[in-house]
Amino acid sequence: MARSLKKGPYVDLHLLKKVDAARASNDKRPIKTWSRRSTILPDFIGLTIAVHNGRTHVPVFISDNMVGHKLGEFSLTRTFKGHLADKKAKKK
């Protein structure tokens, strides 16, 4: 279910403060955050945000195609190891 337009996008206040500080100082270091639920705003374009995936912080470079999505969409939490090969096909 989508968020109501009258409410606007959700962004954690501490993340917004860090982004504003990085923009003001022209800092290129990644911004660490645990806020996977925050929406990507146009102010974030060009910054690298390290999003926590439960184990490590995954660096995500924000481009204009990502605006409107959530940060957690770009930091995968599960590792796909692949399906096992069919044993019948291996024998032949």
From Swiss-Prot:
One of its GO terms (molecular function) is rRNA binding. InterPro entries: Ribosomal_uS19, Ribosomal_uS19_bac-type, Ribosomal_uS19_CS, Ribosomal_uS19_SF. The keyword Flavoprotein does not apply. One of its GO terms (biological process) is translation. One of its GO terms (cellular component) is cytoplasm. It comes from the Bacteria. Pfam families: Ribosomal_S19. Keywords: Ribonucleoprotein, Ribosomal protein, RNA-binding, rRNA-binding. Belongs to the universal ribosomal protein uS19 family. NCBIfam families: rpsS_bact. HAMAP family: Ribosomal_uS19 (MF_00531). Protein S19 forms a complex with S13 that binds strongly to the 16S ribosomal RNA. This is Small ribosomal subunit protein uS19. It comes from Neisseria meningitidis serogroup B (strain ATCC BAA-335 / MC58). The lineage of its organism: Bacteria, Pseudomonadati, Pseudomonadota, Betaproteobacteria, Neisseriales.
